[in-house]
Design a protein with these regions (language model features):
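Acidic donor-binding segment of Leloir-type glycosyltransferases
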Residues: 1-17
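GHKL-family ATP-binding catalytic core of two-component histidine kinases
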Residues: 35, 49-50, 114
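Acidic/His-rich active-site region of diverse nucleotide-sugar glycosyltransferases
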Residues: 72-108
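Conserved nucleotide-sugar donor-binding catalytic segment
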Residues: 97-171
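Glycine-rich, basic loop-to-helix element that forms the pyrophosphate-binding segment
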Residues: 18-34
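Short aromatic/hydrophobic "clamp" motif used to bind/position activated sugar donors
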Residues: 39
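Conserved donor NDP-sugar-binding/catalytic core segment of glycosyltransferases
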Residues: 51-87
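The conserved acidic donor/metal-binding loop of glycosyltransferases
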Residues: 43-47, 76
Length: 171
């Protein structure tokens, strides 16, 4: 109901109920509905800072003005359980570090990238469910040659049983 209320007020909001075919397949289905120039991956139970999209968009525009690659931008994140006012931990990430990214997905959330890049690599691969974002980021960044880091906590990742925010054994 909440989504339908927002959808009635803003035609840019698209909602489509689909069967659960796994995280990668469902993310691919959602990306097909997107009409914008950029995509951002977010989980259904996490929270964006109120200024997250503005800040990421501003970062893209600044990159364009400097004639730097603007295909991939990521931010810092915080983990929370009950309230974002009391984070459990913060992930203050390094600037783009390709060797480190090969070892682990330090980017996670919030990542914003060009939809044309997503389309070029074919989106997420269902056979990579569990590490689908890491696989995607490696393939996207192979094309962009790098990413820009916004050193601000813009994404709040909810920690709960069954979520990888609490540990990878949930996969």
């Amino acid at each position: 109901r909440i989504v339908e209320e927002y959808q009635a007020k803003n035609q840019r909001i698209v909602y489509k109920k689909i069967e659960n075919k796994g995280i990668a397949a469902n993310t691919n289905a959602a990306a097909q509905l997107a009409a914008g120039e950029y995509l951002a991956l977010a989980d259904h139970d996490d929270i964006l800072a109120p200024h997250a999209m503005y800040t990421m968009g501003k970062a893209v525009l600044q990159l364009r003005r400097r004639k730097e690659p603007d295909g991939f931008v990521y931010s810092d994140e915080a983990l929370f359980s009950k309230s974002i006012r009391r984070p459990i931990a913060a992930h203050f990430k390094p600037d783009y570090a390709p060797d480190y990214l090969l070892c682990c997905n330090y980017i996670c959330h919030l990542a914003v990238f060009k939809k044309a890049l997503w389309d070029a690599v074919g989106g997420e691969r269902p056979e990579c469910d569990g590490s689908q974002d890491h696989d995607l980021f490696l393939r996207l960044l192979e094309r962009t040659g790098g990413a820009a880091h916004v050193p601000q906590v813009l994404y709040y990742w909810r920690v709960h049983a069954g979520s990888t925010s609490g540990g990878t054994e949930a996969k």
